Amino acid sequence: MIIWLAELLQPYFSFFRLFEYLSFRAILSVLTALGLSLWMGPRLIKRLQLLQIGQVVRNEGPESHFSKRGTPTMGGVMILAAISITILLWANLSNPYVWAVLAVLMGYGAVGFVDDYRKVVRKNTDGLIARWKYFWQSAIALIVAFALYAYGKDTAATQLVVPFFKDVMPQLGLMYIVLTYFVIVGTSNAVNLTDGLDGLAIMPTVLVAAGFAVIAWATGNVNFSQYLHIPYLPHASELVVVCTAIVGAGLGFLWFNTYPAQVFMGDVGSLALGGALGTIAVLVRQELVLVIMGGVFVMETLSVILQVGSYKLRGQRIFRMAPIHHHYELKGWPEPRVIVRFWIISMVLVLIGLATLKVR
């Protein structure tokens, strides 16, 4: 929105030329989203407390979590508001990639909102019935997948980039839709599974978004994309503003979500943020790099799959509890230790993911 206003005022005020620079708008995006989150945080927390919208803790969960019962939840509303307002202010709204991410962010946010609402109002830890949750997640992902395929059919936008190989970029054809579906839905649920400890999900989300900001910038730059042997996608550069909005909003939320948490993001936040990260990965053609950079999310998801599979096939559990962060809690690790160590792992994995752009 601001970029359109700046274009009108440039002939009269040279200062507005600054808004042409992606780097300047990216900085403003971080600061705006951070500022909005910090401003909304205390107000939202107070409102949630007045409405008695508190976390419902499963009885079969770790005993240490019982003290979290009643902590305000649905704080993801603050994250989504900060991201959306920031994007509308600083992004180029004529860019279709921006709207694709916003569509998934708000669509999955709506699904998460209904899920959280059912939990806190009915005091039911199950929330939205699983089949309906997956139905709406699938519907949104497929609509976006078909739209993106129709827009970029048989171009670099539908190629698969394989890390560590310089020119291995097969054209996916209709398989692009299948891959897009699984990446968006899978990442959404993976972030949701990770969101079990104070600050555990939001910091890896911030780190992965920061990594994708770098990738989006390189992908949208004709010289760097050629140098790194990745597809040149001119629309991708505007995703830098989207990624930095996620970074800023995430850091602002972490201010209140750090241990001991004053508020939880709930499914409204985790499902939406995961869906947004998956969509960004698809748009910059780095789905496989997402697996590396989002390794913490992958690890959490695999621990659940292995736990359920092992119990059904052998009648035995591999971990004391899944997702795996609960396993370490039950081993005696204090919650802050689990959180910070997972953050460190995430930071290392993001750096490895970025290194794959050059190591080919």
Curated annotation (Swiss-Prot):
Residues in the signal sequence: none
InterPro entries: Glycosyl_transferase_4, PNAcMuramoyl-5peptid_Trfase, PNAcMuramoyl-5peptid_Trfase_CS
Location relative to the cell: Cell inner membrane
Catalytic reaction(s) noted: UDP-N-acetyl-alpha-D-muramoyl-L-alanyl-gamma-D-glutamyl-meso-2,6-diaminopimeloyl-D-alanyl-D-alanine + di-trans,octa-cis-undecaprenyl phosphate = di-trans,octa-cis-undecaprenyl diphospho-N-acetyl-alpha-D-muramoyl-L-alanyl-D-glutamyl-meso-2,6-diaminopimeloyl-D-alanyl-D-alanine + UMP
Keyword terms: Cell cycle, Cell division, Cell inner membrane, Cell membrane, Cell shape, Cell wall biogenesis/degradation, Magnesium, Membrane, Metal-binding, Peptidoglycan synthesis, Transferase, Transmembrane, Transmembrane helix
Alphabetized GO MF terms: metal ion binding; phospho-N-acetylmuramoyl-pentapeptide-transferase activity; UDP-N-acetylmuramoyl-L-alanyl-D-glutamyl-meso-2,6-diaminopimelyl-D-alanyl-D-alanine:undecaprenyl-phosphate transferase activity
EC number: 2.7.8.13
Membrane topology per record: Multi-pass membrane protein
Listed GO biological process terms: cell division; cell wall organization; peptidoglycan biosynthetic process; regulation of cell shape
Protein name stated in the entry: Phospho-N-acetylmuramoyl-pentapeptide-transferase
Organism placement in taxonomy: Bacteria, Pseudomonadati, Pseudomonadota, Gammaproteobacteria, Vibrionales
